[in-house]
Amino acid sequence: MKNMNKKSIIFGLMLLLGTSIFAQAIKFSAKDIDGKNVSEKVFADSKITMVNVWGTFCGPCIREMPDLGVLNKKYGDDFQIVGIVIDTVNSKGLVNAKTVNSAKNIVKTTGADYLHIIPDSSLLNGVLSEVYAVPTTFFVDSSGRIVGKVYTGSRTLKQWQEIVESFLQTR
């Protein structure tokens, strides 16, 4: 009986992990902070995309953004960064124009001149429903699937370079 319970628990955990939001390809149709349409097709532009979920209220997020701007330019077509500004919408999915303007100013000030997305309901109810702190960063392959681990908290430029280079070497 004990062995049967263990098998049931292990099977249940495997089932849960296999159906995790992070195991599925990301699909969305949203706008960037400049109002342009953007979808999951953006991931096809590079071998690997670093997705950085951040907030305008988050000091560590903003402090790492200059380094992310440098990182975005370093690896050419093989790599890109996409930011998702988590606090530009409320819990009902309504866009907060004041926060979007704040995000634009932060991007300009920090030199983080990569794509920054206002999350739509499919992002909020999908991959972002498992984000509990910012910054949270994960990597997506060209087909839109999350690869590797999820990173919570900011990192230095050197730390991010090591992580990105390990992804690029395996792709």
What are these regions (language model features)?
Residues K7-L17:
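Sec-dependent N-terminal signal peptides
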Residues T19-A23:
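Sec/Tat signal peptide C-region and signal peptidase I cleavage site
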Residues K47-T49, V53-F57, T88, A133:
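Short pre-active-site segment immediately N-terminal to redox-active cysteine/selenocysteine motifs
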Residues V53-V70:
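Conserved redox-active cysteine motifs that mediate thiol-disulfide chemistry
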Residues F79-A97, A112-S121:
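Thiol-based oxidoreductase modules, predominantly thioredoxin-like and allied folds used
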Residues T99-V140:
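Short, internal strand/loop/helix patches
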Residues F139-R171:
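Thiol-/selenol-based redox modules, centered on thioredoxin-like
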